[in-house]
Amino acid sequence: MHVTSPLVQSHVVACDLLVPAWNYLNRGHHVTIVMDGEAVTAFRLDGTGKTPLDRVTTLRSDLDDLAPLLEVALPAVPKNFGELYRILAREGIRIVANEDVIQAFQIGPGELDPAVSLIDGSEVRRIITDVDAFLPYPVK
């Protein structure tokens, strides 16, 4: 999955990526989400250690949908999208960010959510060209 648009512009944008990633993982696929362009800013930590995604709360309707998807009780569903992305990373989805774009947005070494790994531009190109399936996001 290659993500270039800002993830924090709406609940729909933030959530739409999670469901297919989770479904592909649960079907036994190796999933890598490449954060590129403005998408990298969603994972920038502020002075309190929070990202913009930590400030996008999970809607009640999303909680109802995510509980069975994550196979957890409703109270255990994360209340924000930052934690949801961290769960994806812990469960085996590789979340990477284009190092060149990180530098362009002047995001320092300690300012990126630890769930995200940095890769250089050549690795981004390799990932998006050497795959069995490629899902650009947003889909137009």
Q: What residue spans do the PLM features occupy?
A:
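Short, hinge-like loop/turn segments at secondary-structure boundaries
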Residues: 49-53, 113-116
